[in-house]
């Protein structure tokens, strides 16, 4: 009876230990790649600022979380002139993160050649994989909330991209942050495993030179 009980306890505890161990690895491997804004100028030859997409509102406008990412990405662009890569889910006609991101960015005076769209950033992994293999990016800044940066940076490092993370936590939203932190633990574990096998993204396509004009990526 005791052996059975120990086995049951082990079967319950072991998966929990694995989940949190992998999460710990992802966080620890990435935390020193998160930089402050006053460190940006010290990093040279950056190919792009990757702004990762997320939920849009029912009316098609960016959610508060996405707006924060876009504001931070725009702020860095205005300081550095480094090209923007806006990557999100545009998998259906009725759901379009990417053009919502573009419209937000283009609400200010900006050179259209400097704004690139990736319509097939269906996941964090897809966005970063395509940044390397479609857009030819070797070195980049990644803009998203801190909880998300650990995973994004871990994926980038695993794929051989020199990436630095910049937080987009411009406005406090603790309730949203806590909910996403819980989901993120499992997402980190999933992408930890994915980076071992390094599958290609769901959708590839023709290569796009990030040093060229972003207008070629516009569909509207």
What are the residue ranges of the model-derived segments?
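N-terminal type II signal-anchor transmembrane helix
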Residues: 2-40
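A general structural signal for short secondary-structure boundary/capping elements
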Residues: 92-97, 164-167, 186-194, 209-215
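Enrichment for repetitive, rod-forming helical segments
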Residues: 9-13, 76, 197
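Acidic/proline-rich low-complexity IDRs
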Residues: 10-13, 83, 203
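Short linear elements at protein peripheries
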Residues: 201-220
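A structural signal for short, hydrophobic/glycine-enriched beta-strand patches
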Residues: 25-181
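A transmembrane-helix-recognition feature enriched in membrane-embedded lipid enzymes
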Residues: 178-204
């Amino acid at each position: 009876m005791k052996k059975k009980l120990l086995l049951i306890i082990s079967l319950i505890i072991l998966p929990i230990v694995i989940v949190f161990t992998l999460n710990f690895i992802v966080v620890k491997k990435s935390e020193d790649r998160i930089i402050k804004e006053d460190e940006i100028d010290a990093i040279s030859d950056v190919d792009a600022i990757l702004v990762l997409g997320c939920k849009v509102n029912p009316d098609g406008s960016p959610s508060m979380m996405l707006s924060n990412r876009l504001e931070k990405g725009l702020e860095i662009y205005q300081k550095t002139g480094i090209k923007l890569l806006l990557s999100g889910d545009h998998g259906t006609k009725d759901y379009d993160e990417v053009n919502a991101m573009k419209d937000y960015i283009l609400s200010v005076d900006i050179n259209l050649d400097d704004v690139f769209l990736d319509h097939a950033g269906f996941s964090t992994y897809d966005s970063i994989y395509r940044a390397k293999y479609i857009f030819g990016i070797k070195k980049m800044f990644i803009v998203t909330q801190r909880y998300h940066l650990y995973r994004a940076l871990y994926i980038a490092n695993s794929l051989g991209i020199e990436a630095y993370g910049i937080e987009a936590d411009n406005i406090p939203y603790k309730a949203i942050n806590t909910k996403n932190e819980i989901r993120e633990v499992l997402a980190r574990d999933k992408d930890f495993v994915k980076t071992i096998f390094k599958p290609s993204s769901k959708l590839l396509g023709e290569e796009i030179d990030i040093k060229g004009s972003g207008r070629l990526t516009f569909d509207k």
